[in-house]
Structures are given as structure tokens and as C-alpha cells.
Amino acid sequence: MIAKRYSYTLIFVVLVVIALIILRMQLPSMVKDYLNGKLADMGDYQGEIANVDIHLWRGAYSVHQLEITKKDQPSVEFFNAETIDTSVSWASLFKGKVVADVDLINAEIHLVDDEAEDQPEEESTWRQTVQEIIPLQIDRLNIDNGEIHFHNFTSDPQVHLVFYQLDGEITNLSNAERRDGLKFANFDIQGQVLDSASARLDGRLDPLGDFHNFELKLKITGINLTKLNEVSEAYGNFNFKSGNGDFVMELQAEEAQLTGYAKPVLDNVEIFDLEEDLQDGVFSATWQAIVGAFGQIFRNDPKNRIATEVEIRGNLDDPDVSAWQA
């Protein structure tokens, strides 16, 4: 009788083990289907994941080949990442908190400066989706070889500015409800821009908020000014014949009120002056304040070294100030 009872117990254990093995084999596919279902319904955006790996022993999963596009522009990427590895902290989990570390590997984000238009409420849906599929709290998001692309497809010439080889981290990310106020994250990212210039961006913002409150500092050193000709011609109607220098910009927004400055230190500057009319655009209001002012300085006061400071001020709810969008 006892032997028979042990036999039933053994059979039960074997069946449970087999069920767990089958579940483990099916889990990546189940998670992939769940995530793709969420990513397919993000208002004006849509996304897809190619593959998912589950690492139960370390409480982690890896998402591979994530791509997010706009539904009306499927050929233009908004975001893509080769791998996103998310690992949950067991220590925090035992305390009743879901806290994770995330590694973002070979990721790109594309931002577009276009004509002013009202942003539909649906465009916030991608943020809601992020809140649903990532852990409650991200202790650290590590960026490995990332890229940020800025485009203006309507300017003449078109502008394509790329920050690449980006490495750094973002800390204290939270997808908690914003009823109790903003959830600021700190970031410090370094990389390259304009072929050979070094760039560093640091500050704080609420990435799932409305971008009406933030602080940031951008510093670029070792700029070959001729590499800026797309930007200077599109927004300031002049080209650089030669020159090099450094650039610092600090911006702060509080309840949509934007303040800050841009400060270049440029050496051996020569320019080709173009038409006086400035390119109309959306983010152009800020760019024109910076680039247009530089153009006037170059025209009126040519020197071997130029150091000046341009004030930036405005309201982010004003459609003439900014409309970076996917």
C-alpha cells in the first residue's frame, strides 16, 4: 500500500516536472505574443518583437529586434533596438517591490522636426504601453552603443544629424502613476557627433511625462564646423567654409516655461553667406534663435576666435517653439 502511494506520488512529480518543462519551452513564445499584442495597439504607433529569451535562474528576459514605427509611416522608424535585457532584483522582489536593471544594446531613436500640428491624444498611447510591459521601477538603464537621429525632411537642404556610439545610463526610471507628481530620472550619456566631435548630455526629466519639466546640459567639443552645413544652411542660411570649436547649451523647463542659453567658442571661422530669409519650421524657432544669431555675429564681427552666448526663452506649449515627433 505504501509502495503504491509512493508510486502515485512519483507519477505526480514526474507529471509536474513534464508540465513545467513544456511551460518553460512555450514561455518565450507566450511572452512574445503578449508583448506583440500590446505593441500592435499603441494609437498612432505600432511595434513588433522578433524573439524573446527567458532566463528564469536570474529573473530576466531578453527582447530581440524590437521595432516601433508610425502606422501612417511604416517605412520611417521611431525606435529600434537589437536587444533589451531586463533583469529583476530578487532582493527587492522579496520586499514586495518590482525593481529591475535594463541593458539597451544597439538602440536607435529617430526624431523629426516638421511643420506645426496638434499632437493627437493617441500619441501618448505608446507611453501607456511602456507602463504596462516594463517593471514598476527601473533602477538603472544602461545604454550600450546607442544612436539618436534628428531629421528635418521638409527643410532645404534636408537635415540629418546623428549622435552615435552613445554609452551611459539613466537611473530612477519609474512607470508609476503620475497623480502624485512627476517622477524624475537622471541621465548621463556620452558619444560622438558630426564624425569626430565628442558629445556629453546630462540632466533630468520625466520620460513618461509631458516634457514640460526638465533640466539638461549638452556639451560638444572638437567640432569641425563644415560638418554643420546642413543645419546652418537650413536654419540660418549660411555655410561654413572653415572653422572648428566647442558648443555648450543648457536648458531648463518648469511648467512648460523654457529658459536657457547656447554658447559657442569658435576658431578660424569663415562662412559663405546665403539668402536672408530663414527657413520656416517648428523647432526652427529655437534653432533660428541660435543659428541665426551666430550668422549675424559671423557677418558683422569676423574674428579668428568667436565666443558669445545666445539666450533661449519661450513656452513649450507654443507650436512655434518645438514639435519634435516620431
Task: State each model region's role.
Residues 1-43:
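N-terminal type II signal-anchor transmembrane helix
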Residues 1-10, 206, 219, 238-244, ...:
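Extended terminal
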Residues 41, 123-229, 312-314, 319-326:
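Elongated, acidic membrane-bridging lipid-handling scaffolds
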Residues 44-46, 73-87, 124, 155-171, ...:
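Amphipathic hydrophobic-ligand
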Residues 53-116, 127-149:
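Flexible beta-edge/linker motif
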Residues 66-68, 86-91, 107-109, 146-148, ...:
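Solvent-exposed coil/turn segments that connect beta secondary-structure elements
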Residues 116-123, 235, 278-283:
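Flexible, surface-exposed loop regions and adjacent strand-edge segments
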